[in-house]
Amino acid sequence: MVLDLDLFRVDKGGDPALIRETQEKRFKDPGLVDQLVKADSEWRRCRFRADNLNKLKNLCSKTIGEKMKKKEAVGDDESVPENVLNFDDLTADALAALKVSQIKKVRLLIDEAIQKCDGERVKLEAERFENLREIGNLLHPSVPISNDEDADNKVERIWGDCTVRKKYSHVDLVVMVDGFEGEKGAVVAGSRGYFLKGPLVFLEQALIQYALRTLGSRGYTPIYTPFFMRKEVMQEVAQLSQFDEELYKVIGKGSEKSDDNSYDEKYLIATSEQPIAALHRDEWLRPEDLPIKYAGLSTCFRQEVGSHGRDTRGIFRVHQFEKIEQFVYSSPHDNKSWEMFDEMIATAEEFYQSLGIPYHIVNIVSGSLNHAASKKLDLEAWFPGSGAFRELVSCSNCTDYQARRLRIRYGQTKKMMDKVEFVHMLNATMCATTRTICAILENYQAEKGIAVPEKLREFMPPGLQELIPFVKPAPIDQEPSKKQKKQHEGSKKKAKEVPLENQLQSMEVTEA
């Protein structure tokens, strides 16, 4: 996931000032651009010097061959003249004036210079890449410039009544329909662990089937992805911070051979976007085959580091969940990827409109975008029980930022002489099932249960096609009685703790 290096090179038509400005708008370090330009300039000088040294080495070999052919004297172990040791000014005439033994010494010295130059070049290349991968994509002009997501995300449009309030939040409703086991889930799997059960399993499967059918009717190919990826591939699709804050690492045997003691490092996927992005790694995609549209289905795993204390109850923010994802490879020409961007968010909107879930679309501020996204729109559903908007969908155009690192190229240049182009890559959530279930529960709660959205009824089993009944009391309604019981038990305990002499004094007063 990187920008084109030529964008940093003025002599190649690049504009480092523009990238510096982009970094400032993202509220990231613009100094990375200057560090990269410096490392790249030194790298290019080093490569130029290495190329010249290799030419000199070839010239030495050619000159030796010519002298041997003429049967010139090889010469004794004579020293090399000082003027010849300046390789920047070394000419064919200067070499021709030397003995064969001297030229061989020069060639050895050139070899040493090449090795030194190659070492410097590798070091500079690593330094350049470290800066390059931490510099974000160029921003679309419509992105709001701010570092305050809560205050400055721009609301683009609203659908449905986002003022309605209802009694219960999803935290209570998952318990009331007996579709969730959180305490035992936490014992088995740790923090945010859960068992989804009963009617909510059927509701989740209904959402998956409906989402896949919807995308299938729009030309998307359903694809069920691997749940883990090799480290070297994950490094090409995830930014550095994700390895610490989001991804789970898995260690396993390097192969199926019983005598193989090597170990392989892999990472659980946070979204099917990651393996689908790598699906066409190292390929040339033909213009006539684009756009390529995938409906990714997978379980997703996220550490959620940094969300401590947020949404700790219920199933809205969990470490493991199912998700259907839109993913598209697009042409980089004629604004095609931005047309596809509009189409993808529209598809998500139609899906939630068909489910009758009110929402608004927000344009995410520059400071909250990940490195790859040039622009991101979120669909935030209205949760009438919580009295808040909550994110259900994120739609991003990453332009060629991901494709460049994955080497997914556009077309094929004539005789491979033209500048290589890369496809544009886009992703958008269609349905993260646990979050969508929460939205349905809050919006469709009624006196006796949860009304099933009409579009999902054909996917539900008999007895649950119209209503998911409440079978347990709401935890929030039980909290006052629990609190009173606790206070009563506390009073009894305090009474027992009263010293004996105080009790006797009390009895004497009563008798008097």
Curated annotation (Swiss-Prot):
CDD domains associated with the record: SerRS_core
Record keyword Coiled coil present: no
Q: Which residues carry this modification: N-acetylmethionine?
A: 1
Q: Where in the cell is it found?
A: Cytoplasm; Nucleus
Named from the GO MF annotations, one term is:
enzyme binding
PTM annotation (Phosphoserine): residues: 241, 506
Q: Where is the composition biased (Basic and acidic residues)?
A: 479-499
What ranges does the record list as Polar residues composition bias? 502-512
Q: Where is this region: Disordered?
A: 470-512
Q: In which pathway does it act?
A: Aminoacyl-tRNA biosynthesis; selenocysteinyl-tRNA(Sec) biosynthesis; L-seryl-tRNA(Sec) from L-serine and tRNA(Sec): step 1/1
Reactions it catalyzes: tRNA(Ser) + L-serine + ATP = L-seryl-tRNA(Ser) + AMP + diphosphate + H(+); tRNA(Sec) + L-serine + ATP = L-seryl-tRNA(Sec) + AMP + diphosphate + H(+)
What GO terms fall under cellular component here? cytosol; mitochondrion; nucleus
Q: Please provide the record's keywords in A-Z order.
A: Acetylation, Aminoacyl-tRNA synthetase, ATP-binding, Cytoplasm, DNA-binding, Ligase, Nucleotide-binding, Nucleus, Phosphoprotein, Protein biosynthesis
Q: Which GO terms describe its biological process?
A: cytoplasmic translation; negative regulation of angiogenesis; negative regulation of transcription by RNA polymerase II; negative regulation of vascular endothelial growth factor production; selenocysteine incorporation; seryl-tRNA aminoacylation; tRNA modification
**Pfam families cross-referenced by the UniProt entry:** Seryl_tRNA_N, tRNA-synt_2b
Q: Which residues bind L-serine?
A: 271, 302, 325, 427
Residues bearing N6-acetyllysine are 323
Q: Give EC number(s), comma-separated.
A: 6.1.1.11
Q: What is known of its domains?
A: Consists of two distinct domains, a catalytic core and a N-terminal extension that is involved in tRNA binding.
Q: State the protein's purpose.
A: Catalyzes the attachment of serine to tRNA(Ser) in a two-step reaction: serine is first activated by ATP to form Ser-AMP and then transferred to the acceptor end of tRNA(Ser). Is probably also able to aminoacylate tRNA(Sec) with serine, to form the misacylated tRNA L-seryl-tRNA(Sec), which will be further converted into selenocysteinyl-tRNA(Sec). In the nucleus, binds to the VEGFA core promoter and prevents MYC binding and transcriptional activation by MYC. Recruits SIRT2 to the VEGFA promoter, promoting deacetylation of histone H4 at 'Lys-16' (H4K16).
> Belongs to which family?
Belongs to the class-II aminoacyl-tRNA synthetase family. Type-1 seryl-tRNA synthetase subfamily.
Partners and quaternary state? Homodimer. The tRNA molecule may bind across the dimer. Interacts with SIRT2. Interacts with METTL6; interaction is required for the tRNA N(3)-methylcytidine methyltransferase activity of METTL6.
Q: This protein is called what?
A: Serine--tRNA ligase, cytoplasmic
Q: Which organism is it from?
A: Mus musculus
What lineage does UniProt assign to this protein's organism?
Eukaryota, Metazoa, Chordata, Craniata, Vertebrata
